Amino acid sequence: MDGVADLVVIALLGALTLLTAGHVLALRSRSRAVAAQAQQWADRIRADAENAARSHQDRLLAEAAAYRAELDRREQRIAAQEQRIERELRRLDAARRQLDERTAQLDQRAAELARLAEERRAVLEQAAALTAEEAKAALVADIVDQAKREAAVLVRAIERDARTNGEARARRIISLAIQRLAGEQTSESVVRAVPLPEEAMKGRIIGREGRNIRAFETVTGVDLIVDDTPGVVLLSCFHPLRRETARLTLEKLVADGRINPHRIEEAYEASRREVEQQCVRAGEDALLEVGISDMHPELVALLGQLRYRTSYGQNVLAHLVESAHLAGMMAAELGADVPLAKRCALLHDIGKALTHEVEGSHAVIGAQLARRYGECEEVAHAIEAHHNEVEARTVEAVLTQAADAISGGRPGARRASMESYVKRLQRMEEIAYAVSDGVEKVFVMQAGREIRVMVQPEAVDDVQAQVIARDIAKRVEEELTYPGQVRVTVIRESRAVETAR
């Protein structure tokens, strides 16, 4: 048994040896195949790398050749520019040398001319017995006098041309605007009459020991006049808004029949609210009539208050509406902004609603109100410039001035007191006499709309007469307030008298 086992073991070992040897041989052959394949791959990669390196080298060589050619071209251009710069520098050096030579020659000639001028001045001073300063002063005086005369002649020619062309067109535009406007004109006095249903009502208005009338005057700020005039009592106040409120208050008291201090206060409060509503409605009606749709409510209310204010007897709100129509029509004729011109003219006197409450002229106050309540700068400027307190810089501002003057200066628009009228005429005469010593007589004619000045012919020539007329007109514009325009006429008359015997 042991021998068999040994044989089996030996056989197994031999088989394993054979299998191992075969496997080793197979592995060796596979390794040789893999090595051959790897060698092929390596050869292929090496060939590809060599080809890529050669192509990259060729591309780099081509780029280097291109860069070298570009550098050569740039070097050639730089060399050409350097040559041009050198030539320009040589030319500039030559020109500088010539300029220095010319400058030296000019300096030499200037010195020579100065020497000759000094010699000539000395000769002239010796010949004329005048120093250079005295001769210069005399020459300047002659030139100034001649320039004044030439300027006066030129001004007269320009004014003549302006009158010939400008006045004709302005007259046509204003005439068209006036004839297209047909506005009503109303004026109020400081006294308002209130009718009574019966004469016995006067006693009830006065009250016991006059307590009702005192309470009425205290609450309303209006004087209540009860006299012998049958069927009416009078309300007197210079403030039109308070006067209207007092009128409504008294009418309510008379209609109710109960008149006592407590009832007076109640009626006054109701009337005050009613007047405020009337002011708003009046402002809205004015906007509707002019054709303006948007405006701050405070400005509308202030505009309505002007319904109860007058200027020289002219209702201010009616004047504003009339001015707005005139400004709009003139703007249309001139091709200007019609809505803006209407707005400027409608608001130009808005400051009069607060002149008794705020310090300052109504033009400045009105401009401040316009800016405060969102109006554009053109409107505010037209308001503050309509009385020349600020120089007018826009067409709308000038149209506002013209519309204001037309509306206030047309016949029947305003009335003035006799005292102010006489003072204005006297001031016109004083201005005319003060302008020149050559004024001999002054006549103010046509209710202050024309000033005729008689001058001394030996003291004033024709050119000076034109200057005197212009100076008088300018001072009248600056110092006086008047409706319409004032014409200044200077008359220079020469008479030669001889007697035959």
Swiss-Prot record:
Disulfide bonds: none annotated. GO terms for biological process: mRNA catabolic process. The keyword Acetylation does not apply. The chain crosses the membrane at residues 7-27. Keywords: Cell membrane, Endonuclease, Hydrolase, Membrane, Nuclease, RNA-binding, Transmembrane, Transmembrane helix. It is found in: Cell membrane. Pfam families: HD, KH_1, RNase_Y_N. Residues 316-409 form the HD domain. SMART domains: HDc, KH. Its EC number is 3.1.-.-. It comes from the Bacteria. GO terms for cellular component: plasma membrane. GO terms for molecular function: RNA binding; RNA endonuclease activity. Residues 190-256 form the KH domain. The keyword rRNA-binding does not apply. InterPro entries: HD/PDEase_dom, HD_domain, HDIG_dom, KH_dom, KH_dom_type_1, KH_dom_type_1_sf, Ribonuclease_Y, RNase_Y_N. It is a single-pass membrane protein. HAMAP family: RNase_Y. Endoribonuclease that initiates mRNA decay. Belongs to the RNase Y family. This is Ribonuclease Y. It comes from Thermobifida fusca (strain YX).
